[in-house]
Curated annotation (Swiss-Prot):
One GO molecular-function entry: RNA binding
Lineage: Eukaryota, Metazoa, Chordata, Craniata, Vertebrata
InterPro entries per record: RTRAF (IPR019265)
Family membership: Belongs to the RTRAF family.
Protein name: RNA transcription, translation and transport factor protein
Oligomeric and partner information: Homodimer. Component of a tRNA-splicing ligase complex.
Annotated function: RNA-binding protein involved in modulation of mRNA transcription by Polymerase II. Component of the tRNA-splicing ligase complex.
Alphabetized UniProt keyword annotations: Cytoplasm, Cytoskeleton, Nucleus, RNA-binding, Transcription, Transcription regulation
Primary location class: nucleus
Length: 240
């Protein structure tokens, strides 16, 4: 109910404030007058601070009148809201220059296309998370956790994205192959065995092509990391 205004005033427990609790309410009012409103001089706040006095309700009523609150003692919820509004206005007035010169949060932070640039690579939670992902995806460990994360990102983009999964799940329609047009290079003496040998050779060629594709993808991924200007090339050597 009052959480936002209490937060604006740096109240110690904005979410848990219970205005129906008499002791908490009285302590809150003392804090509000001492720290924010400051309508009374310090020496005039004694009666308001004496929260255990039987005269405190009368003092509270006097306080509402002194600050020109339009609500009565019985209208506690409304009077609290009004007092908080007064405190916020006074707080802003005391610190107007500070608030006017304040810049929106993250206004000076450029939105980089590189999402990894603002990560704290020394954070233990970050390291533990990267290591867990690397183990899950069977990625080679590296002393540079940021480089490991980049490798994870490349793998996810290439293999686990929605497009990659859809592509892998789609049926591959093969073309009919005329086995007799593929020269085997030897003769087993059996036509059936010759056809089986041709099929095995074609399957082996297909596996080699897939392996070459994976090698090319790995080379591209490594080149992307090496081309990063933030990569520390002192970690490796070229030549002797």
């Amino acid at each position: 109910m009052f959480r936002r205004k209490l937060q604006a005033l740096d109240y110690h427990n904005p979410a848990g404030f219970n205005f129906k609790d008499e002791t908490e309410f009285r302590n809150f009012l003392v804090w509000l007058e001492d720290q924010k409103i400051r309508h009374y001089k310090i020496e005039e706040r004694g009666n308001l601070r004496n929260i255990h006095s039987s005269e405190w309700p009368a003092q509270y009523e006097k306080y509402l009148n002194d600050v020109n609150c339009p609500f009565k003692v019985q209208e506690r919820q409304e009077s609290i809201d009004w007092l908080l509004g007064l405190a916020v206005r006074l707080e802003y007035g005391d610190n107007a220059a500070k608030y006017q010169n304040a810049k929106p949060y993250n206004s000076d932070v450029s939105k980089s296309a590189e999402p990894l640039i603002n990560l704290d690579v020394n954070n233990p939670d970050f390291k533990a998370g990267v290591m867990a992902l690397a183990n899950l995806l069977q990625i080679q460990r590296h002393d540079d956790y940021l480089m490991m994360l980049k490798a994870i990102r490349i793998l996810v983009q290439e293999r686990l994205s929605q497009e990659a999964v859809a592509k892998s799940n789609s049926a591959k329609e093969g073309l009919p192959v005329a086995l007799d047009k593929h020269i085997l290079g030897f003769d087993t003496g059996d036509a059936v065995l010759n056809d089986a040998a041709r099929i095995l050779r074609l399957l082996h060629i297909e596996e080699l092509r897939e392996l070459q594709t994976k090698i090319n993808e790995a080379i591209v991924a490594v080149q992307a990391i090496i081309a990063d200007p933030k990569t520390d090339h002192r970690l490796g050597k070229v030549g002797r």
